[in-house]
Amino acid sequence: NINIKKDSSFAMLLEAQRRGYELHYMEMADLYLINGEARARTHTLSVEQNYDKWYDFTGEQDLPLADLDVILMRKDPPFDTEFIYATYILERAEEKGTLIVNKPQSLRDCNEKLFTAWFSELTPETLVTRNKAQLKAFWEKHGDIIMKPLDGMGGASIFRVKAGDPNLGVIAETLTELGSRYCMAQNYLPAIKDGDKRVLVVDGEPVPYCLARIPQGGETRGNLAAGGRGEARPLTESD
């Protein structure tokens, strides 16, 4: 499921191969525990910058995860119980000395949307709730808001609700599944027309360029998967 035109996983595969690493590919269903040992069924592969045929599987094996030097956890959301179980399996390999990127405990602790609550001074006004009345009050206060699920990706199920929109109720019911799931609401920031920014941090240091994702064609969403245009930009002082 890797899109080599935009997915950073492909760039990582190319660079790891260039540095002489043997590449192993595995999915969630390939991970398992046996008597406390983390193992996986893996495919070795080679990659190349070729849109028609960018990978070739070269072998298949079943091995302890502790035999691998580095594991890059690249699973996309949803952040569900299966995702959490996978981090526990990876943690067993981490205890044996394998470098897991990112750290399994951090993947569990730092939900990419909810974790913003730990630095709310840098975010729009944000409400996380499953209560429809609270969502309505937040909308009435701001008049123009963004509503989204906590476990989505790629711009899926993100709604902009303007003042007077008659769909607020059904959007709230859909996102919260009639009050049984949390969702997030934020006041709309017009600056999104200039793009949002993805800043990468490696070992605590920001990469000097960020990815700006710019909405296209009247869209609110800048996600590349939703048609946004990607643009590399140098970091500013405020970034």
Indicate residue ranges for each PLM-predicted region:
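Short acidic, glycine-rich loop/turn motifs
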Residues: 49, 149-151
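Short catalytic-loop micro-motif centered on adjacent basic/acidic residues
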Residues: 101, 125, 146, 184-186
